[in-house]
């Protein structure tokens, strides 16, 4: 039985977690990593992996996934494998405010594995949104937004910006003699960047992942 791209990515995640942490991910962690709405989708893919002989599951254990067949041999004696270009493993770097700017927190909290097709352009990392000032763009509190790292942006693009060591996501507006960061929620006021402020574009918004809540 052939595996889908998602199932291959799940198998890679299982092997990686066993290698790095010594234990496989739980079904809940797999669902969260791939943005599934619930664990039933994770169960479906795990059943397919088991039927294909790639894993076996120990009944009654929350982390009862075991590698089997070729996957187990590959872990014991890893072979050189081509890098897949359709799957991304992205670090989650703290939080970004979609509201008032909050202090930057760039420590890597977690990694998420997902298909590249969710984003354009390709992101370099994810940030967790706090606040609802970008609500009318469909960006909500708790979303994970993809960020393409760049210092260049055009007026009208949604950017992740740094203002005096604080990070925020807003709509960039560049005027003749001023720069403003606009919310997409009428309950919030625009942020005008003052000449004496330390301001920089950290990246472009390029899509989002909505974790199951």
UniProtKB/Swiss-Prot annotation:
The keyword DNA repair applies. Represses a number of genes involved in the response to DNA damage (SOS response), including recA and lexA. In the presence of single-stranded DNA, RecA interacts with LexA causing an autocatalytic cleavage which disrupts the DNA-binding part of LexA, leading to derepression of the SOS regulon and eventually DNA repair. Belongs to the peptidase S24 family. SUPFAM superfamilies: LexA/Signal peptidase, Winged helix' DNA-binding domain. One of its GO terms (cellular component) is protein-DNA complex. The keyword Protein biosynthesis does not apply. InterPro entries: LexA, LexA-like, LexA/Signal_pep-like_sf, LexA_DNA-bd_dom, LexA_repressor, Peptidase_S24_LexA, Peptidase_S24_S26A/B/C, WH-like_DNA-bd_sf. Pfam families: LexA_DNA_bind (PF01726), Peptidase_S24 (PF00717). The record marks 98-99 as: Cleavage. GO terms for biological process: DNA repair; DNA replication; negative regulation of DNA-templated transcription; proteolysis; SOS response. Keywords: Autocatalytic cleavage, DNA damage, DNA repair, DNA replication, DNA-binding, Hydrolase, Repressor, SOS response, Transcription, Transcription regulation. The active site is at 133 (for autocatalytic cleavage activity), 170 (for autocatalytic cleavage activity). It comes from Xanthomonas campestris pv. campestris (strain ATCC 33913 / DSM 3586 / NCPPB 528 / LMG 568 / P 25). One of its GO terms (molecular function) is serine-type endopeptidase activity. This is LexA repressor 2. Coiled coil: none annotated. Residues 27-47 bind DNA. Its EC number is 3.4.21.88. It is an enzyme of class 3 (hydrolase). Homodimer. It catalyses: Hydrolysis of Ala-|-Gly bond in repressor LexA. PANTHER family: LEXA REPRESSOR (PTHR33516), LEXA REPRESSOR-RELATED (PTHR33516:SF2).
